[in-house]
From Swiss-Prot:
Monomer. This is 3-phosphoshikimate 1-carboxyvinyltransferase. The keyword Cytoplasm applies. It comes from the Bacteria. The active site is at D313 (proton acceptor). Pathway: Metabolic intermediate biosynthesis; chorismate biosynthesis; chorismate from D-erythrose 4-phosphate and phosphoenolpyruvate: step 6/7. It comes from Klebsiella pneumoniae.
Amino acid sequence: MESLTLQPIARVDGTVNLPGSKSVSNRALLLAALARGTTVLTNLLDSDDVRHMLNALSALGVHYVLSSDRTRCEVTGTGGPLQAGSALELFLGNAGTAMRPLAAALCLGSNDIVLTGEPRMKERPIGHLVDALRQGGAQIDYLEQENYPPLRLRGGFTGGDVEVDGSVSSQFLTALLMASPLAPQDTVIAIKGELVSRPYIDITLHLMKTFGVEVENQAYQRFIVRGNQQYQSPGDYLVEGDASSASYFLAAGAIKGGTVKVTGIGRNSVQGDIRFADVLEKMGATVTWGEDYIACTRGELNAIDMDMNHIPDAAMTIATAALFARGTTTLRNIYNWRVKETDRLFAMATELRKVGAEVEEGEDYIRITPPLTLQFAEIGTYNDHRMAMCFSLVALSDTPVTILDPKCTAKTFPDYFGQLARISTLA
């Protein structure tokens, strides 16, 4: 297996221009495809997950022109539901941001489409979304295991009253919201259980509004979406930088700055993961905000005990930043780590112990006490981009670290290690 050994980093300082947000890129691509008119997306993320969405749209007959660096995309909208000419199978890798929204969008009209993906995708639950779509009339079959992809979709979603469980993934609600305006009837979506990762719903609502569709949001408990609508292209849309990707550089600044500035997001960002910077501030770092940047300067870091449900992806970065904080850090209410690219609670606990931390892994929390000195380790990445990026922070100590399968960062950030090296001074 390929590996990358990072030598100890004495200091980080500089500016990182963030690649486009994965969450925003894939939502914007789908809405642009469904909309009337042509949309030019700029700062689109070039990564595996976005390529899976682009390939699927292409197979569905959507016409787009992609620039040579794949960050500008001109999409010719279809002005309504996506219709496949014939029976089709779409392979979506391990891209939840393609699988879930497409599963809903392709239940509009009359298609015969199979959605499948990598082995791990077949372990990521989708039953709550399927249940909700079926309540709205969709014809969906599980081809292998009940409640998991691959799925066969044969249209039929007409709207009406649907209830969706919000406790596992906000992507199920996102998928329903984006498809519902194109259903023939109004859709009333009721949330069952606690809605996790709520800020991701705000991204969805913001993008729908950008494409001309407003949703009545009743305190995140009920959402009313008028049917028979059409998305309208906004013309041009700039995809903001990826706030989850920003977390590694901001944390590096907190641990070994200097000052690290990330551009492409700022105080008015639509992504909830910018709140990650508040957590670093709480731990003792200095954070400054601009319209188009966030900067983080080193501070004496202290442990925290916090509910991280609002920023599950960025919270992983706090788990490795905790290695550099005084005291025991507890991250709570993160059960949904278990249903991501890998079981992230198990993976994080296992790898943190390798570098010498004392770790308690709960069903939905993790408690981390750092060692006096970090130990050298080979870090398994579980084909999970965030594991690779999180554990690169170990090099901000006096100890090198080896990352196995470093190319798994291609899911969201192909040039991550290059960007980290650019702002690093080796010990």
